């Protein structure tokens, strides 16, 4: 049996989304960085290390896409119109009741 050659172990690498800042400006995801004549994706690589107490920022394990915020669903026009009609009916009923009370009070005064 011959001895097999082993490949040297490489540290696990993790993709981080944003490139380093150049002149205080953050590169956006759709801008590409050129390395020589080859177009390379805008990703920097960091080695994953165990977190220490002094380390504040966590190294992301993967680049997550930003989630779109969902808008709350509004009731459709049919429900809106029904609610408006009911509100108007109750308002009219209340106004009629107040008017009839005023009429009764006016008749008592005379």
UniProtKB/Swiss-Prot annotation:
Alphabetically ordered keywords of this record: Chromosome, Developmental protein, Differentiation, DNA-binding, Nucleosome core, Nucleus, Spermatogenesis
InterPro entries referenced in this protein's UniProt entry, alphabetically: Spermatid_TP (IPR040433)
GO terms under biological process: cell differentiation; spermatogenesis
GO cellular component terms, semicolon-separated: nucleosome; nucleus
Presence of the UniProt keyword Membrane in the record: no
Localization annotation: Nucleus; Chromosome
Molecular function as annotated in GO: DNA binding
Domain of life: Eukaryota
UniProt region (Disordered), positions on chain: 80-110
Main location: nucleus
Function comment: Involved in nuclear basic protein transition: histones are replaced by spermatid specific proteins which are themselves replaced by protamines in late spermatids.
Protein name per Swiss-Prot or TrEMBL: Spermatid nuclear transition protein 3
Source organism of this protein record: Ovis aries
């Amino acid at each position: 049996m011959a001895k097999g050659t082993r490949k040297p172990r490489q540290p696990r690498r993790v993709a981080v989304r944003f490139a380093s800042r150049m002149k205080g400006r953050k590169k956006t995801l759709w801008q590409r960085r050129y390395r020589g004549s080859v177009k390379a994706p805008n990703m920097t690589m960091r080695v994953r290390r165990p977190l220490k107490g002094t380390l504040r920022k966590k190294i992301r394990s993967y680049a997550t896409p930003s989630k779109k915020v969902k808008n709350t669903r509004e009731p459709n026009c049919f429900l809106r119109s029904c609610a408006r009609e009911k509100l108007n009916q109750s308002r009219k009923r209340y106004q009629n009741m107040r008017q009839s009370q005023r009429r009764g009070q006016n008749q008592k005064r005379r």
